[in-house]
From Swiss-Prot:
GO MF annotations, alphabetized: pyridoxal phosphate binding
N6-(pyridoxal phosphate)lysine modification, residue list: 47
Gene3D superfamilies: Alanine racemase (3.20.20.10)
UniProt-listed Pfam families: Ala_racemase_N
Gene: Plpbp
Function: Pyridoxal 5'-phosphate (PLP)-binding protein, which may be involved in intracellular homeostatic regulation of pyridoxal 5'-phosphate (PLP), the active form of vitamin B6.
HAMAP family registered for this protein in UniProt: PLP_homeostasis (MF_02087)
Ion transport keyword on record: no
Organism of origin: Mus musculus
Entry protein name: Pyridoxal phosphate homeostasis protein
InterPro entries referenced in this protein's UniProt entry, alphabetically: Ala_racemase_N, PLP-binding_barrel, PyrdxlP_homeostasis
Gene Ontology, cellular component aspect: cytosol; mitochondrion
Lineage: Eukaryota, Metazoa, Chordata, Craniata, Vertebrata
Residue(s) carrying Phosphotyrosine: 69
Length: 274
């Protein structure tokens, strides 16, 4: 069974993808029957990795990729080799987004989803920017929740969730609300029971759906990374963000400079576990 980035480097991206997809299906089989029967989406997180590795993963059937930094995503998604070799590619932005970077993000070719809306003001800015682009369909967005309560992580307070989702649905016609996203605390000991941060997101979804009259199966849950994606799927995740297990460990010495407008929180590799 594939566990670490070192094996990925030795055996290749195709082998790693097959192994991850097998583990995804094993986890789906262990999921309680009372959860929505939604096939989890695998987001291959390619941050710090070259275009050739994205193309290799695409060649092995992967279609959805994620990036944490706006500039890196824009450069990678605009790469001529990726544009020509990966016509069906879909990009998710999964990092912290500041309002001054919104227009740059909206210019990303094949942008499919923004997973990290964390305020009404950001939602309004994204809605306006996407509207000006003149798209044929709304941009899919998730609302990010800080379920762990850690200062080092971005996201709404759980108590703010319903109000922000209501605002998006009522006042942002160029956005399509599709789910909730969280990072959660790292290193939870599963012998102590399910990750409480994941459980908190499930509870929030139930409360949200009851309050707004939304069918549960229409609200995705993005939770789980390389170190905990199987547990996340077992408890209900429909979108897992996996990087090093597919592409190998990252060399941060070669990572592109962070967006100049990134704040102190964003400069910390919060989602290094992808």
């Amino acid at each position: 069974m594939l566990r670490g980035g070192s094996m990925t480097a030795e055996l290749g991206v195709g082998f790693a993808l097959r192994a991850v997809n097998e583990r995804v299906q094993q986890s789906v089989a262990r999921r309680p029957r009372d959860l929505p029967a939604i096939q989890p989406r695998l987001v291959a997180v390619s941050k710090t990795k070259p275009a050739d590795m994205v193309i290799e993963a695409y060649g092995h059937g992967q279609r959805t990729f994620g990036e944490n930094y706006v500039q890196e995503l824009l450069e990678k998604a605009s790469n001529p080799k990726i544009l020509s070799s990966c016509p069906e590619i879909k990009w998710h932005f999964i990092g912290h987004l500041q309002k001054q970077n919104v227009n740059k993000l909206m210019a990303v070719p094949n942008l499919s989803m923004l997973e990290t809306v964390d305020s009404v003001k950001l939602a309004d800015k994204v809605n306006s920017s996407w509207q000006k682009k003149g798209p044929t369909e709304p941009l899919k967005v998730m609302v990010q929740i800080n379920t762990s309560g850690e200062d080092s992580k971005h996201g709404l307070l759980p108590s703010e969730t319903i109000a922000v989702v209501e605002h998006i649905k009522a006042s942002c016609p160029s956005l399509e609300f599709v789910g909730l996203m969280t990072i959660g605390s790292f290193g939870h000991d599963l012998s102590q029971g399910p990750n409480p941060d994941f459980q908190r997101l499930l509870t929030l979804r139930r409360e949200l759906c009851e309050k707004l009259g939304i069918p549960v199966e229409q609200v995705e849950l993005s939770m789980g990374m390389s170190m905990d994606f199987q547990h996340a799927i077992e408890v209900g995740s429909t979108n897992v963000r996996i990087g090093s297990t597919i592409f190998g460990e990252r060399d941060y010495s070669k990572k592109p400079a962070l967006d100049k407008t990134a704040d102190a929180k964003a400069s910390v590799p919060l989602v290094q576990g992808h």
